[in-house]
């Protein structure tokens, strides 16, 4: 796989009144060509600062950023402007020109790049069709829904045929149904146009719906990185557990007693009656503390937190049984949910 974005040792701080605020601290990141790469974290983790450093909307303090084989930090202003043509970007707030039509908004980057008007219009109409807004070329932003505005922003970001599209919380202001439609469009763009996409989000559902790889950012550092399925199956950090299991699991009140086990299953296993099988085969009951299912890249995944019996022999029978089923499971330590 070819690396298209390589970040090493990236750090960025801001003056926060009496003390310096560290937004990024020694961040390493690798994105491969063709990825839909997610960066997820809680508010204030440094996500937006990271994505804005990639095209130098923010200037890093330390570290290297290699994009398309170029050291972005070494470029002068003229060279940077040329490099940015290969890096499209969309934002939460759309940033459309309110007094310009959809067609005029999409044409705008090409006007700046001194395209001929006829060529710019042809390209804009192609992209407006791609994002599903044919027939609305003359409409203005005030006449559009939030989802439509984001589609215009996506079309505008693609005008100069970038190899990379950066999405900074691009679905955060949208309702769930509209979010799914925008993510479906991004997946289409990735597949049909070969655009590598980086999605910044605080929503695990966005990662599950669209991404093949993910980094988890916490308190200015990358704490986990890998394929979405692997991170989902084996979260190693507290923040990953919190993001994957969700708030419901985080507030589960555990009763004192037996060991707690996290069970993860996918594909056909997601529909197997695992708890009933445990009871029948091990002659012992478990206490379900939390359970949910979700779909990642078209595959149904499920997970449970269960509490085993106090009786050590019964608990061991269950662990032995689970080992034989091939289901992914791990014993959870106190405080890890």
Task: Describe each region flagged by the PLM.
Residues 18-19, 72-88, 117, 231-235:
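ABC ATPase NBD coupling module
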Residues 70-71, 107, 111, 118-135:
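Conserved ABC ATPase "signature" region
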Residues 139-142, 160:
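Conserved signature/switch motifs of ABC ATPase nucleotide-binding domains
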């Amino acid at each position: 796989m070819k690396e298209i974005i390589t970040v090493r040792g990236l750090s960025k701080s801001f003056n926060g009144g009496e003390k310096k605020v560290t937004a990024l601290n020694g961040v390493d990141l690798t994105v491969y060509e063709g990825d839909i790469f997610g960066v997820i974290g809680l508010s204030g983790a440094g996500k937006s600062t990271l994505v804005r450093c990639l095209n130098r909307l923010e200037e890093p303090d330390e570290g290297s950023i290699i994009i398309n084989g170029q050291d972005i930090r070494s470029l002068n202003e003229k060279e940077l402007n040329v490099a940015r043509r290969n890096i499209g970007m969309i934002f939460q707030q759309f940033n459309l020109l309110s007094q310009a039509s959809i067609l005029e908004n999409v044409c705008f980057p090409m006007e700046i790049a001194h395209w001929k008007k006829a060529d710019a219009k042809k390209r804009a109409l192609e992209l407006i069709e791609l994002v599903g807004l044919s027939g609305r070329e003359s409409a203005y932003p005030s006449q559009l829904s939030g989802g439509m505005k984001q589609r215009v922003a996506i079309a505008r970001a693609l005008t100069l045929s970038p190899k990379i599209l950066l999405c900074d919380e691009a679905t955060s202001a949208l309702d769930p149904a509209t979010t799914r439609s925008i993510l479906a469009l991004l997946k289409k763009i990735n597949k049909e146009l070969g655009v590598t996409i980086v999605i910044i989000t605080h929503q695990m559902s966005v990662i599950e719906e669209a991404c093949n790889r993910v980094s988890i950012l916490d308190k200015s550092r990358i704490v986990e990185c890998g394929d979405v399925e692997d991170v989902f199956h084996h979260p190693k950090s507290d923040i990953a557990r919190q993001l994957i299991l969700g708030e419901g699991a985080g507030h589960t009140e555990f009763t004192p007693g037996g060991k707690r086990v996290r069970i993860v299953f996918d594909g056909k296993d997601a529909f197997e009656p695992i708890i009933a099988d445990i009871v029948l085969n091990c002659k012992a009951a478990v206490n379900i503390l939390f359970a949910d299912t979700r779909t990642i890249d078209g595959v149904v995944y499920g997970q449970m937190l269960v509490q085993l019996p106090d009786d050590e022999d019964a608990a061991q029978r269950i662990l032995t049984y689970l080992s034989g089923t091939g289901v992914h499971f791990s014993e959870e330590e106190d405080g890890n949910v």
